[in-house]
Amino acid sequence: MRFKMNIKKSKRAKSFLFILVFMALHCRLLPRFAGSSDFDEAILEEMQARRIPSVVACIIKNTDIVWMRSYGLADKEISIPATDQTIYLLASISQTVIATAVMQLAEKGLIDIDQDVGLYLPFPVRNPNYPQSIVTPRMLLTHSSGLAGPKTDDELPGFYDWFSPDAAPPLAQTLMDYLLPGGSSYVPAVWKESAPGRMELYSNLGVTLLAYMVEFVSGEEFSSYCREHIFLPLGMPGTSYKIADLNPENLAVWYLENTQPIPHYTRRDYPAGQVKSSVSELAHFLAAWMNGGAYKEVRILNSDTAAEALRLHNPASGLCLLWNLMIGGWYGHSGGVNGASTYMEFHKQDKVGLIILSNMYLESENPIYPPAGKIYGLIRQYANQFRGPA
């Protein structure tokens, strides 16, 4: 089934007390007791103001969750509260899973991210405007291949159509239809007037191509590869691209910005945004990246491989290999799509990270996104208390 998308005793002592009171009264981003009822109330007030059904969040130190909260309802219609087991759509956070899979293959010597991506596919990949220039996996990992986003469904008609859960067309079909000249949905606008490797242009199509490369080289369907080689080894059985793998009782309802519920769906570019997970399980994945590719006794990447993925490629934007390096040494990724607003980040040196998930996307002034989001600001301020040695 297919359907269209709707598109935070001395004068000195008295002065210090005055400062604390002033901050609590006049800066809602800085509640006096972070993690207390004041803290929770500040988050709930922001949720109510923006009509957000639920928010779940956690802070990780080293490999342990040191704080976790669930606010609001996973299902408003029948008043099911959100919990740390509620499964949310992760949206573009999913791209860090693609980066993990690609770097696993590179680590095994099955691909070279600086060679022609066509070497690892059953068809060539060339920008017709620059036919002599190769497109490499690294370019795709840094959104610099020259491929369209697309920004809107008009740019590549039908690319962002919705499908019933787990029923998206095969990746090979999507890519041959949209990417190859002569494909049923091919339009010249799929390639931009930018030579491969020259300009950063965010591309869901490009990261979907990476996912298909993983599928073709490994011989495993992409969602199955991720489940077997990333999620299950990390102790994440309630995490998958496929809804069929998950407990339906734990799935959050997805909502539009107008608070209307929408059916669970998938898209042609599902690798770029369709991982579903809970905050408690996603913490394992974030902890692995925060600790050089290992979560407790499980290693999904060698430390050198993880370091390469986190190496800065574009100082202007902070882009690494699908991860973003931000001011202060924090690496993160956001996600936003109908039914979800998500964000996660970690500080590599201090080994502290945070995750925020919600079951509604807000187009503007989203409170869970940095730098100005109120909910993000509250949680980030609390996370800062865990920086430094354990």
Feature-to-residue mapping (PLM):
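Secretory-pathway/luminal and periplasmic proteins that interact with or process carbohydrate-rich
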Residues: V66-M68, P124-S133, T142-D153, S223, ...
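A short, well-structured edge-of-sheet supersecondary motif
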Residues: Q48-P81, I113, P170-L180, P237-S240, ...
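Hydrophobic h-region of N-terminal signal peptides that target proteins for export
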Residues: L20-R28
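Active-site-proximal loop and beta-strand segments within enzyme catalytic domains
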Residues: L73-S203, E220, L256-Y265
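Bacterial N-terminal signal peptides that target proteins for export
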Residues: N6-F16
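Catalytic loop of the DD-peptidase/beta-lactamase superfamily, centered on the K-T-G motif
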Residues: C27-S70, L119, F159-D161, R198, ...
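Short, well-structured active-site flanking segments
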Residues: E77, V97, M103-P122, V217-D245, ...
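Active-site SXXK
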Residues: I43, A57, T63, L89-D114, ...
